Amino acid sequence: MSWRSESIWIEFRTGSRKTSNFFWAFILFLGSLGFLLVGTSSYLGRNVISLFPSQQIIFFPQGIVMSFYGIAGLFISCYLWCTILWNVGSGYDLFDRKEGIVRIFRWGFPGKSRRIFLRFLMKDIQSIRIEVKEGISARRVLYMEIRGQGAIPLIRTDENFTTREIEQKAAELAYFLRVPIEVF
């Protein structure tokens, strides 16, 4: 989603609150909870959950391994739910031609650097760079090349844009900022 006028362009970034993250966090939670319950059932020697007969699973080694996988899965699921709750990676890119300033803001993990805020002058922007790697794991990234700071990614690699959409976005942004486009 974006908002645009003659002198200001704002691009909003979604972050980690995406449908796929909700889906995987939920599936991982249920799967790891199932593993932990089966491991606990094999330890106790009775069915905690009636779907799986635990008498067929011996605690050592199968029950221990299933309990370990269940605990590990719960930790990973907790991590995913925390990133969704904190909305890590969301923010905005603001390009202001009137003031000649670019502001990039992203939410990070809680702590000292929770708010990631970059600010620099438009005259320091050297180019807009497109990096395209085709193949099995295709990767299309849009960067902004800044004098003295290197390349700053503007579009995340997990956003599934086609090559045409990336080129269109790069062309619009380069036209707005009045800088050249580089393709790698």
Curated annotation (Swiss-Prot):
Family matches, as Pfam families: Ycf4
UniProt topology in membrane: Multi-pass membrane protein
Gene designation per UniProt: ycf4
Family: Belongs to the Ycf4 family.
Subcellular location: Plastid, Chloroplast thylakoid membrane
Entry keywords, A to Z: Chloroplast, Membrane, Photosynthesis, Plastid, Thylakoid, Transmembrane, Transmembrane helix
Xref: InterPro entries: PSI_Ycf4_assembly (IPR003359)
Gene Ontology cellular component list: chloroplast thylakoid membrane; photosystem I
Lineage: Eukaryota, Viridiplantae, Streptophyta, Embryophyta, Tracheophyta
Role noted for this protein: Seems to be required for the assembly of the photosystem I complex.
GO biological process terms held by the UniProt record: photosynthesis
Name of protein: Photosystem I assembly protein Ycf4
Transmembrane region(s): 22-42, 57-77
